């Protein structure tokens, strides 16, 4: 997917839903004891091919979630979905987290765990096989999944890159 088309998405026009992936409590040690803060990873999507993630930090959980949702709306990408799945297998890596995603036949279901499941549900993918390898840190797993979905090229992108028609791409 080209970066140009990702910038054309206007989150205000989409009916975005949010899903909380992870909340982390942090502590800062001060003279009088510990001061707690929170950060939240939130995935937003319309379940029709648009998905984004955001990280919010605040002193209260609800504020952190709200900030995460706002950040997520700024990072929305378009995912090409073909018959409820992805067009081709992908392996994406972010930090030490690695996510493997394979297309599946209709009726297989969403086979994914933890953070990857949230991303794929919000994107609207119904049939897919995934495996999360390496680090299980939700921050990096979400970013690896988004990076993988962003790297998907549909038939139109391939035809454009090869300077061919869509028919020629399918014949080759």
Curated annotation (Swiss-Prot):
GO terms for molecular function: rRNA binding; structural constituent of ribosome. Gene3D superfamilies: 3.30.160.20, 3.30.230.10. GO terms for cellular component: small ribosomal subunit. InterPro entries: Ribosomal_Su5_D2-typ_SF, Ribosomal_uS5, Ribosomal_uS5_bac-type, Ribosomal_uS5_C, Ribosomal_uS5_N, Ribosomal_uS5_N_CS, Ribsml_uS5_D2-typ_fold_subgr. Keywords: Ribonucleoprotein, Ribosomal protein, RNA-binding, rRNA-binding. Residues 16-79 form the S5 DRBM domain. GO terms for biological process: translation. The keyword Acetylation does not apply. With S4 and S12 plays an important role in translational accuracy. Located at the back of the 30S subunit body where it stabilizes the conformation of the head with respect to the body. Part of the 30S ribosomal subunit. Contacts proteins S4 and S8. PANTHER family: MITOCHONDRIAL RIBOSOMAL PROTEIN S5. The N-terminal domain interacts with the head of the 30S subunit; the C-terminal domain interacts with the body and contacts protein S4. The interaction surface between S4 and S5 is involved in control of translational fidelity. Belongs to the universal ribosomal protein uS5 family. This is Small ribosomal subunit protein uS5. It comes from Chlorobaculum parvum (strain DSM 263 / NCIMB 8327) (Chlorobium vibrioforme subsp. thiosulfatophilum). The gene is rpsE.
């Amino acid at each position: 997917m080209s970066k140009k088309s990702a910038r054309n998405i206007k989150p205000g026009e989409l009916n975005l839903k949010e899903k909380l992936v992870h909340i982390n409590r942090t502590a800062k040690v001060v003279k009088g004891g510990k001061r707690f803060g929170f950060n939240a990873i939130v995935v937003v999507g319309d379940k029709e091919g648009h998905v984004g993630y955001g990280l919010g930090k605040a002193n209260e959980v609800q504020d952190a979630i709200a900030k995460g949702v706002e950040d997520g709306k700024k990072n929305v990408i378009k995912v090409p979905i073909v018959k409820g799945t992805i067009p081709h297998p992908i392996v994406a890596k972010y930090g030490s987290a690695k996510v493997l995603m394979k297309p599946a036949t209709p009726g297989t279901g969403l086979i994914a765990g933890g953070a990857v499941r949230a991303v794929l549900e919000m994107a609207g993918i119904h049939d897919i096989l995934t495996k999360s390898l390496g680090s299980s840190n939700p921050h990096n797993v979400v970013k690896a999944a988004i990076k993988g979905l962003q790297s998907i090229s549909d038939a139109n992108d391939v035809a454009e890159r090869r300077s061919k028609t869509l028919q020629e791409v399918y014949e080759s």
